[in-house]
């Protein structure tokens, strides 16, 4: 069975490969979030019946992998100061759901 659908104006096509083809992390959907509230809301909805993973990854109740990532992560990690960027990376590696305040605290360390 083939299905097409739109999310936020972007068209997607999905093919049912049958019971022998399971979802894996080889395919994931990336959601760029502007605020912590958006991260929190999506994380709560998608992990209900699903499972949390490391570094902003999760699986929804259907087994589809998602990356729920605040825009701030890219902004902080792309800093020209490699020490600051590495501190942000190290903080993120300790997280499941990404926390913007904790990233900012790692970035701001003297």
Residue ranges and their predicted role:
Residues 1-110:
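Glyoxalase I/VOC metalloenzyme domain signal
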